[in-house]
UniProtKB/Swiss-Prot annotation:
PANTHER family (alphabetical): PROTEIN FMC1 HOMOLOG
Gene: Fmc1
Locations listed in the record: Mitochondrion
Source organism (scientific name): Mus musculus (Mouse)
Name of the protein in question: Protein FMC1 homolog
This protein's UniProt keywords: Mitochondrion
Record flagged with keyword Mitochondrion: yes
InterPro entries: FMC1_homologue
C-alpha cells in the first residue's frame, strides 16, 4: 500500500464509499451506524498540538486499508457486471464473435453429395 496521506482525506474517501453503498437504498448515508462510528472514531483520535499518538496512526492505517478494500470491491463488481459471461454460447454465436460464419448445406435438409 502507498503512503497514507492525511486522515481527513482517508475519512472523506470512506464517506464517499458509504455514499456509493447507500445509493441503492435511497437513504442518506449520514443516517447509518457506520457513518456515526467513523466520525466518532476520527474525532476521538484527532491529534492536538504536537502530541503524537500511536492509536491515531493505527486508526488511520486501518481506515486506509478498509477504504482500499471498499473501493476494490466496488471496482470488482463494476468490472464483473461489464465483462461477465453470458453462459454457454451456441456454435453460431461463438463463430460470429471471431468474425466467421458456419458453412451452409447447399441442398438443405437431406442433401447428400
Amino acid at each position: 500500500m502507498a503512503a497514507l496521506g492525511s486522515p481527513a482525506r482517508t475519512l472523506r474517501g470512506l464517506l464517499r464509499e458509504l455514499r456509493y453503498l447507500n445509493a441503492a437504498t435511497g437513504r442518506p448515508y449520514r443516517d447509518t451506524a457506520a457513518y456515526r462510528y467513523l466520525v466518532k472514531a476520527f474525532r476521538a483520535h484527532r491529534v492536538t498540538s504536537e502530541k503524537l499518538c500511536r492509536a491515531q496512526h493505527e486508526l488511520h492505517f486501518q481506515a486506509a486499508t478498509y477504504l482500499c478494500l471498499l473501493s476494490s470491491i466496488r471496482q470488482h463488481v463494476a468490472l464483473h457486471q461489464e465483462f461477465h459471461g453470458k453462459g454457454e454460447r451456441s456454435v453460431e454465436e461463438s463463430a460470429g464473435l471471431v468474425g466467421l460464419q458456419l458453412p451452409r448445406q447447399p441442398g438443405g435438409k437431406g442433401w447428400e453429395p
